[in-house]
């Protein structure tokens, strides 16, 4: 954001978030989210709005840095971000959802099934999607379609579980892989 005019930063941020979602990659919004809370116990209205807008744009994760690394009010900063993000989640509108088209020429069965599973949660009385995952690909596909209900991803590798912790709406659960399906 240093080499572009400051008035372009919000638009660029929104475009980058959209591109990441379309590419099914986790997107983290960071950098000075609550910068004034390094030295002050309360954020500015602009900072609160920045957090809410990141949620409205459907970012996967928010991150604090200096506020918690060396700020005077690290716990207050975390509590503030949590409260603002939770309220923004309640207030977000469906018309802000990013529509992710399926490539008609693609044979990506995982993406197709993920989109159908997310659609099903809005049409049927389904309150969660459960998947297992070695690499996290299926869970990331489900996250990209930004469903209303959580994706419970059972991961056989701790690294996959940690990576999925950043994905929108995904609750990753580690389960050691057993020798065969009969053992589960």
Label the model's feature ranges:
Residues 35-57:
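Catalytic cores of alpha/beta
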Residues 32, 54, 142:
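Conserved, mostly hydrophobic/aromatic
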Residues 1-2, 50-74:
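Glycine-rich phosphate-binding active-site loops on the catalytic face of alpha/beta enzymes
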Residues 13, 68-91:
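C-terminal helical cap(s) of enzyme catalytic domains, especially alpha/beta-barrels
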Residues 4-32, 36, 147-148:
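Helical hairpin unit composed of two closely spaced alpha helices linked by a short loop
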């Amino acid at each position: 954001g240093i080499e572009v005019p400051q008035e372009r930063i919000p638009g660029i941020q929104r475009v980058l978030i959209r591109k990441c979602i379309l590419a099914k990659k986790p997107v983290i919004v960071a950098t000075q989210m609550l910068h004034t809370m390094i030295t002050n116990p309360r954020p500015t209205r602009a900072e609160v709005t920045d957090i809410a807008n990141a949620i409205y744009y459907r970012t996967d994760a928010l991150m604090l840095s200096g506020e918690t690394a060396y700020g005077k009010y690290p716990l207050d900063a975390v509590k503030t971000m949590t409260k603002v993000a939770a309220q923004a989640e309640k207030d977000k509108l469906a018309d802000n959802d990013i529509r992710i088209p399926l490539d008609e020429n693609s044979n990506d069965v995982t993406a197709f099934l993920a989109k159908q599973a997310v659609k099903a949660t809005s049409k049927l009385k389904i309150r969660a999607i459960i998947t297992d995952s070695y690499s996290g690909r299926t869970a990331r596909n489900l996250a990209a379609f930004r469903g209303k209900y959580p994706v419970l991803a059972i991961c056989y590798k701790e690294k996959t579980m940690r990576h999925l912790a950043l994905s929108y709406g995904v609750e990753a659960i580690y389960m050691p892989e057993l020798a065969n399906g009969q053992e589960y």
